[in-house]
């Protein structure tokens, strides 16, 4: 078994995550970035766009919305961990049938508490489908009005849980925003059957999810994949065993981990001689892909990144390890970026940070100013 140093592990993961410079000729379309990562968490659309920015070259924020609303090569719906994601549209044919039943079952008790029994859910979803087919896109409030017209009165938190169920069953997804408000559309109308990809058997879908996970996050473990996907560990273990001939076992921090055999050549490549510095946004997938973050976040600063409540703050990443946080303020056509490092930054890292801040402003189409606060 090959034993990897922490630096080697972080270097491999950075490359898998598209956080190293892309080789000449590499495809950097929005859809390709999303597919390579097997989804990008997107409960905050601006943060999801910035996750794409940091993994591409030359794209701008408008390209992300164009890919979602006009080209429809990516779709915003509920996916991994039961949270909103940008997913490659061509992956929906196997991802939704794989993930949906697990999260629908996991939400059963909460639906019951909210008065959403199976009969109500089935009747309400039929009404939603008809309403969107005839009048969509519709906002949540407009959907609630349509339900009321059919004698189905849904209040409070029952509303998002009903829409969540409808999305996990593959009936609906998010459509174009209307005056900064979310709208919903019929998935079949929005993307068309031919664009959602082919379904897979349950076993094949689990195996594909494992390959895609390791493609973006390896070296890693089944426990890491289970935490990232929200799928049962037993199913994940079975999937790993089914593709064992495609994996290499390595040692990470004294414990076994795995990566794809197709990535074996990466083990012989040295880490970059210059620092790789990235400004990761809130909820970036680099920090969501593992059971623990000890390799990427210094333990004494963990609460600076995640103080609780599921919030992951924007981070400064230096060679795969979080070296601080950052925040930005939008002032008309100006972006003010403030970096809060954990320790003093060397000049070379500061120079890379300036390049990142400049590219962030380019992506957003604004001018920028940035400064580094004293370490704390």
Question: How should these model regions be labeled?
Answer:
Residues 1-294, 298-376:
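Long, low-complexity intrinsically disordered regions
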